[in-house]
């Protein structure tokens, strides 16, 4: 069971309650919630906010691929996974991503949650622009839309 979505920050905030409603089931004995939030310091620069941009269709496709790969690589068939990522400007402390997983056992839930966030960071086409207290801003290194074959 999978739910994926890119959420425009102008329209809605990410919600732990939405994630909990989606993954809750008597079939599962373990739930893990991961949230990423905008922090105030990165690379010794004082951050005031971040704009997230993405290629929405390819991001959703990458989330779906990661979910399917988890079946093969982790051998966790019975699971519920909720992934939402924000798009647009976020202030300090606001959530940029929610990953919620439910599995039969806690060890499965921990492994699955970690696998999902690490794979998203490696390959989903999501980019962020940080804004700093000195009125400067920088686009940070992100993932390309097409990965080069070596």
Region roles according to the model:
Residues 1-95, 106, 110-114, 118-150:
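N-terminal, polar/charged subdomain of small-to-medium soluble alpha/beta proteins
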Residues 100-102:
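Short hydrophobic/aromatic beta-strand micro-patches
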């Amino acid at each position: 069971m999978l739910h994926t979505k890119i959420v425009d920050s102008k329209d809605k905030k990410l919600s732990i309650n939405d994630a909990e409603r989606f993954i809750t089931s008597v079939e599962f004995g373990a739930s893990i919630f991961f949230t990423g939030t905008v922090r105030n310091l990165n690379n010794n620069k004082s951050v005031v906010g971040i704009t997230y941009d993405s290629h929405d269709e390819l991001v959703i496709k990458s989330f779906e691929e990661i979910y399917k790969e988890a079946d093969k690589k982790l051998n966790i068939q019975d699971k519920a996974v909720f992934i939402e990522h924000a798009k647009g400007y976020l202030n300090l402390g606001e959530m940029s991503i929610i990953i919620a997983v439910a599995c039969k056992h806690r060890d499965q839930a921990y492994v699955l949650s970690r696998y999902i966030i690490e794979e998203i960071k490696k390959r989903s086409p999501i980019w962020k622009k940080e804004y700093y207290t000195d009125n400067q801003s920088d686009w940070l290194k992100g993932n390309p839309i097409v990965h080069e074959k070596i």
